[in-house]
Amino acid sequence: DIVITQDELSNPVTSGESVSISCRSSKSLLYKDGKTYLNWFLQRPGQSPQLLISLMSTRASGVSDRFSGSGSRTDFTLEISRVKAEDVGVYYCQQLVEYPLTFGAGTKLELK
């Protein structure tokens, strides 16, 4: 199985700051069609996970442009600019390049 690793944030974030959340895969997620099969989700407290970004960098419908995804093959970053209270929750990355589809353990974002 592909192992997805996410790091914890070292400190709570101040509202208005930017933050980067990292994700690493044990195998390249660049498929033969040229697309990178990595999703980002946000699970807000008490809610179901919401898809933020698919194919590494494509924002889902209705998702703020404060969220951006980037990366290459095995190393990925979710950048959140001008953090707001509504961004608090657990961020998960997911690989879709092979079954079983696997998630990282999540990165919790908290505000100061």
Swiss-Prot record:
Keyword Disulfide bond carried by entry: yes
Region (Framework-4): 103-112
Biological processes, Gene Ontology terms: adaptive immune response
A Pfam cross-reference name: V-set
Disulfide bond sites: C23-C93
Region (Framework-2): 40-54
Region (Complementarity-determining-3): 94-102
Example of a GO cellular component annotation carried by this entry: immunoglobulin complex
Residues spanning the membrane: none
Keywords: Adaptive immunity, Disulfide bond, Immunity, Immunoglobulin
Domain of life: Eukaryota
Residue numbers spanned by region Framework-1: 1-23
Region (Complementarity-determining-2): 55-61
UniProt region (Framework-3), positions on chain: 62-93
Additional notes on this entry: This chain was isolated from a myeloma protein that binds phosphorylcholine. The sequence of the V region of the heavy chain has also been determined.
UniProt protein name: Ig kappa chain V-II region MOPC 167
Provenance organism: Mus musculus
